[in-house]
């Protein structure tokens, strides 16, 4: 009994331990679409804009040149007469995985030893925070966008045994290998509070209505009545943003089949060849809007991740308690060793802004000390 208790205690402490490598990490964050265009042959096209805001079909469109003035409208942007902020959402620069690989030596020379990638999973948006799927890297980040689509369409999204590796996936796995060959680490963004409108399960609900087996994945307020000309389909989006359908939860977090899907995603990217050695996989996750997902789910998520890779690092985005009044969460409940190793420290950033950037309402050193 004593041996069993000691063993359980050791397992619990291993799960709670922050990986040593993370404590000395010098991070570099990469927004893939805007980092470097390493392969112009895979650049987004006018067709790849479909499925994200703005939804208007464009008669003309082109990749934005990297060195152009951010506020300068391109000829095609001037023709649609919609202004800067509308067109900024349509812009694509062609950044991709090859572009990241090309600059790894440069990053290493800077002293970087850990990379955090904003979302890389398939998505119509430039930011990729509204996923179309989690099982594949965005096809415009890899060398064969058309071939990747053929592979997606041959799979059962719920059955990992049917999942294959696309050209974009394989290039991403090469990126992981190249990162590890330089004694660097890599983590990726996990967005599991919401998805994009083209997400495969949401589209199934949209097409089949109440007959869809994925109805309980989302917060559906009303289904469409085919007997009427109106579309009554209504659902909840993240912070009311209907571009990002929100995942349903109860007091324990998302439902069982969604959890099983995410568990399979964790295993896929944590140990791609499934041999029990996680050295070919990612080194952790940054979890988006983590405070909006139940802690019970994140406790399970941590166990899944650490079962695959005991040295994996988890950091959560724990941000607004009251968005309208700029009140942020105290992140302590997420940092007890059973959920995250760290959080995105927005409270620190906010204090720095108030002390050193905000000249109008600049706080005093004593006030900064209190905030810290």
Locations of regions flagged by a protein language model:
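Long, low-complexity, polar/charged, intrinsically disordered or flexibly structured peripheral segments
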Residues: 71-78, 235-256
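Active-site-proximal helices and loops of the catalytic beta/alpha 8
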Residues: 176-184, 194, 202-209, 264-265, ...
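Aromatic- and acidic-residue-enriched segments that line the glycan-binding/catalytic groove
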Residues: 19, 23, 39-63, 123-143, ...
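An active-site-proximal structural segment forming one wall of the substrate-binding cleft
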Residues: 104-110, 114, 168-182, 200-221, ...
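N-terminal structural segment of carbohydrate-active enzymes
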Residues: 11-185, 193, 256
């Amino acid at each position: 009994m004593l041996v069993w208790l000691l063993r359980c205690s050791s397992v619990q402490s291993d799960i709670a331990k922050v990986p040593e490598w993370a404590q000395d990490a010098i991070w570099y964050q990469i927004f893939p679409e805007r980092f470097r265009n390493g392969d112009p042959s895979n650049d987004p096209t006018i067709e790849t804009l479909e499925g994200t805001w703005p939804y208007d079909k464009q008669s003309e469109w082109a990749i934005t040149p990297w060195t152009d003035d951010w506020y300068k409208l391109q000829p095609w942007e001037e023709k649609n007469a919609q202004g800067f902020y509308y067109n900024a959402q349509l812009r694509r620069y062609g950044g991709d995985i090859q572009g990241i690989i090309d600059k790894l030596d440069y990053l290493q020379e800077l002293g970087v030893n850990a990379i955090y990638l904003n979302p890389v999973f398939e998505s119509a948006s430039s930011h990729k925070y509204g996923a179309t799927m989690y099982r594949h890297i965005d096809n415009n980040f890899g060398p064969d966008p058309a071939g990747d689509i053929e592979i997606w369409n041959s799979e059962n999204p719920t059955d990992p045994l049917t999942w294959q590796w696309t050209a974009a996936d394989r290039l991403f796995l090469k990126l992981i290998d190249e990162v590890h060959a330089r004694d660097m680490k890599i983590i990726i963004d996990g967005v599991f509070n919401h998805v994009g409108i083209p997400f495969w399960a949401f589209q199934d609900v949209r097409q089949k209505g109440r007959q869809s087996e994925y109805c309980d994945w989302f917060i559906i307020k009303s289904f469409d009545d085919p007997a009427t000309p109106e579309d009554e389909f209504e659902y909840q989006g993240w912070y009311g943003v209907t571009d990002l359908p929100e995942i349903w939860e109860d007091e324990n977090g998302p439902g069982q089949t969604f959890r099983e899907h995410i568990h399979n995603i964790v295993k896929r990217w944590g140990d791609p060849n499934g041999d029990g050695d996680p050295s070919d996989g990612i080194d952790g996750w940054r979890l988006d809007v983590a405070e909006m997902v139940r802690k019970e789910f994140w406790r399970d998520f941590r166990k899944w991740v650490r079962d695959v890779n005991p040295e994996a690092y988890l950091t959560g985005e724990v941000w607004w308690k009251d968005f309208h009044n700029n009140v942020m969460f105290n992140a302590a409940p997420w940092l007890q060793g059973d959920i995250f190793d760290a959080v995105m420290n927005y409270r620190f950033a906010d204090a720095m802004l108030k002390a050193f950037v905000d000249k109008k309402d600049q706080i005093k050193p004593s006030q900064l000390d209190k905030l810290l």
